[in-house]
């Protein structure tokens, strides 16, 4: 599924770059329906990009991904939810992932100012909304989760 989704994205991206209306998004939505992988045709993705077990992968429109990047199921490269999100139209809203990065299952990396450096490994179930320097590893430690009362529930 990952190969198919990437192949369809590459075709859609070229059409997107040539300002072809609607068709690029239709192509990526067909790929999404067949694979469970949602890559916006506006995303910029380098060479040697690999998606393994891709169900639930979401890559937003202004995401930039470098070369030799590998991601696993459930990864979201998305925008932060903001009250004034409409003000960010035509601006960088999604993260930048540099070269030689591995992002494991169910990690969420959010925000246009978020940059993941070269040679970084992002562990599973990690939620990131700030930049990570080159040559780092980010992991979720179960001792650090919090349980809070729900408001109104």
Q: Predicted regions span which residues?
A:
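Short, conserved active-site entrance elements at the starts or edges of catalytic domains
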Residues: 17-47
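A generic structural motif
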Residues: 46, 54, 64-66, 133
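Short beta-turn/strand-loop junction motif enriched in small, turn-promoting residues
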Residues: 55-56, 108
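Glycine-rich hexapeptide-repeat left-handed beta-helix
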Residues: 67-153
């Amino acid at each position: 599924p990952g190969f198919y989704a990437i192949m369809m994205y590459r075709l859609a991206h070229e059409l997107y770059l040539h300002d072809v209306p609607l068709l690029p998004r239709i192509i990526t939505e067909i790929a999404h329906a067949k694979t469970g992988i949602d890559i916006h045709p506006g995303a910029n993705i380098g060479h040697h990009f690999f998606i393994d077990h891709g169900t639930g992968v979401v890559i937003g429109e202004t995401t930039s991904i470098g070369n030799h990047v590998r991601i696993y199921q459930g990864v979201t490269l998305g925008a932060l939810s903001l009250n004034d999100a409409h003000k960010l139209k035509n601006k960088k809203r999604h993260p930048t992932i540099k070269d030689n990065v591995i992002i494991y299952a169910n990690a969420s990396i959010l925000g246009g100012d978020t940059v993941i450096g070269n040679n970084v490994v992002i562990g599973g179930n990690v939620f990131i909304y700030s930049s990570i320097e080159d040559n780092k590893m980010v992991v979720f430690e179960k001792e650090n989760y919090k349980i809070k009362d729900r408001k109104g529930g």
